[in-house]
Amino acid sequence: IIDEQLLWFAYTQSGDPVAFFIVIPDLNQIIKHLNGRLNWWGMIKFLLLKMRGALTRACGVIFGVVPDHQGKGVESAIALRFRTAARENPFYPYETMDMNWVGDFNPKMLRFVSQLGATNEKTYITYRLFFNPDQPFSRCPKVG
């Protein structure tokens, strides 16, 4: 289920696509009320909950900019437009947005998230267990 308010694309003046930002509604807010049953009654209940406004959270899924246009303000323009569109629309149903799995090795994406006005509420830590303890460990290099 995709909400058109959450899909953003950027184009050049000639009409070539240069960037996109795709966000989806967090359907877990509704699915938890179905108790794992997505039968006919579950589908009706799903639609009723959706129409009633049970979806208040969205999840940022993917963001990308064509390499030739990176660092030219396209990222900031999408972030600013997304943010103002949400604030200007009185019927905008989403109160929060999760931007999961933005690694600390990706400073460009961290900057984009901060431009959206986001705060860091969760930090995920990935642990490694080497079967060969003599193998050297190297951290993931920074992107960009």
Where do the language-model regions lie?
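A conserved beta-strand-loop-helix scaffold within acyl/acetyltransferase catalytic domains
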Residues: I1-V65
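Terminal substrate-recognition subdomain of acyl/acetyltransferases
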Residues: D3, Q13-S14, F46, M51, ...
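Generic structural motif recognizing short loop/turn segments at the entrances and edges of beta-strands
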Residues: D16-P17, T56, V74, T123-I125
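Aromatic side chains
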Residues: F20, H69, Y124-Y127
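Short coil/turn motifs at secondary-structure junctions
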Residues: D26-N28, D68, D104, N132
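Short conserved micro-motifs at the rims of enzyme active sites and ligand-binding pockets
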Residues: K32-L34, Q70-G73, L110-R111, F137-C140
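Short linear motifs at secondary-structure transitions and domain/linker junctions
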Residues: H33-W40, G73-E75, N100-N106
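Conserved acetyl-CoA-binding loop-helix of GNAT-fold acetyltransferases
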Residues: R57, V61-R87, Q115
